[in-house]
Amino acid sequence: APDAEHIIIAMGSVCDTIAETVDYLNAKGEKVGFLQVHLYRPFSLAHFAAALPETVKVLTVLDRTKEPGALGEPLYGDVCSALIETGRTTKVLAGRYGLSSKDVTPAQIIAVFDNMKGAQKNHFTVGIIDDISNSSIEVGAEPDLADASTVSCKFWGLGSDGTVGANKNSIKIIGDHTDKYAQAYFEYDTKKSGGITRSHLRFGDKPIRSSYLVTKNANFVACHNQSYMEKYDIVSEIKPGGTFLLNCTWTPEELDHHLSAEVKRTIANNNIHFYTIDAIKIGKEIGLGNKTNAILQSAFFKLANIIPVDDAVTYMKAAI
């Protein structure tokens, strides 16, 4: 906002998330802003001074680094020096983000703005809980900032079961054969083969600025391994009215027994569309053996309704 009173200054991987959150907050009537550093060296004092509105009351500088023993991180030091050079006495807070490759989400950016308006804790961390020196700030509930056209999906798979490869193929099909923007992130644990994998897909009619994993408000979630239902909280990630696909060998009676009361309650209270598929049985019947990735990929295209399922199958065959 041109009359912003609280501004975050940052560079690097956090910028899209900050911009997305600032637009969301300003649409609600708040006076917040974001100053992105595109070229760090040489640091342009003239451009910095011109970009900073006179209305600003508090600044927070976010660095993705930790320099023990220093008075502050590099960008924070430069901003403080720049303010002195220009004769301004605006209060400046320092924060660290992304340590240990932690995701930075809109809720964390909102927490940074709340800190400026409230306690004004300095030299804080966000996105990681610091229970040693207690430098972290409190983070609230995660808002849904996605554009109405954006579809968020998450797939829980088993290492080497083909889930990640199928999703890479899916996002390529959507990106190549539709006008939609596409984004994909993939998580693996240390086991690789036999370990847990998580695939995070987004696509929509507008550029996607959500540079963080899908952990809440997903339109579509698929669990490709039935044992995960007893180990992980999967259905809470689905938004009301979303779709949940479970690959399992359970009969309806066994399904009722294996799903916890909490899972059933979440599905019912949020009107989640719940589907099951026995991809292993189908694979054996059609000669694919234990290879379930193509079957589950087809189920995704059928349920997600992004492109005609017949076209999707054609593109899948072409990719093999």
List PLM regions with ranges.
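Redox- and metal-dependent alpha/beta enzyme cores, enriched for Fe-S-associated oxidoreductases
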Residues: D3-E30, F43-F48
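Flexible, glycine/charged-enriched surface loops at secondary-structure junctions
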Residues: A1, V32-G33, R88-L93, A119-I129, ...
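Short helix-loop-beta junction
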Residues: E20-F34, E85, I173-D179
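Extended, charge-rich low-complexity interaction segments
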Residues: V61-C80, M116-S133, K216, A304
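Glycine-rich phosphate/diphosphate-binding loops that line cofactor/substrate pockets in enzymes
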Residues: A1-P2, A27, A50-V58, D144-T150
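Active-site cofactor/cluster-binding pocket
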Residues: P42-A46, V58, L62-E73, S149-G159, ...
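C-terminal non-catalytic interaction/assembly regions of soluble proteins
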Residues: N26, V32-K102
